Amino acid sequence: MKVNPSVKPMCDKCRVIRRHRRVMVICVDPRHKQRQG
């Protein structure tokens, strides 16, 4: 899980979602998981 000021999809499978007022990227590749913070 990377915590970045700006989250961007890294591949075609990445999905940008909002959970509990947080912007997150979920993907089949665990290295692509990101959270804004």
Curated annotation (Swiss-Prot):
Keywords in alphabetical order: Ribonucleoprotein, Ribosomal protein
GO terms (BP aspect): translation
GO cellular component terms given for this protein: cytoplasm; ribonucleoprotein complex; ribosome
Pfam families: Ribosomal_L36
GO molecular function, one term: structural constituent of ribosome
Disulfide bonds: none
Signal peptide range in chain numbering: none
Keyword Phosphoprotein: no
The family this protein is said to belong to: Belongs to the bacterial ribosomal protein bL36 family.
The protein, known as: Large ribosomal subunit protein bL36
Species name: Mycobacterium leprae (strain TN)
Upper classification of the organism: Bacteria, Bacillati, Actinomycetota, Actinomycetes, Mycobacteriales
Underlying gene: rpmJ
